[in-house]
Amino acid sequence: IIIANSVDAAGICHAIRLLNPKIKLGTSEWAATERLAEIGGKWVEGITVAQFFDRDSRAPAYLNFRAAYQSRFSREPGFPETFSFDATNVILDAIESQTQNPGQSLKEIVLARQQFNGVQRPITFDRNGDTLGKTFMVRIENGAFAPIRK
């Protein structure tokens, strides 16, 4: 398991594959951007990632976000773009709620409310501020992330 960003993970995969091309590799969601496949090329083929991002989401809010993102940036949004959009909306909702709850911190508002609308699914925070959600297993195949089907 490689815990690194996409650039470092690609380099580590390259070094490992030179030593043992058949070794099974996994990486953290942090590395699971489209840049990993782009930079890593053949060295990252077959790498497995567990992530909360659903590349095949059919949620209407996600499809709208995806279309708007593609129109503006001429490329698909990945997990950083999607989760940044969701995080921004959580904070904006909390700021709006703060006007009705003066004296409460944004953290207190988020933890008290617990659930917010995300573009792929509801965002639920536990009492520690961690999000709860379904995990999607993907693997890089032919230079792209592909879901691992059971």
Positions of the model-derived regions?
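Extracytosolic ligand-binding ectodomains
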Residues: 1-150
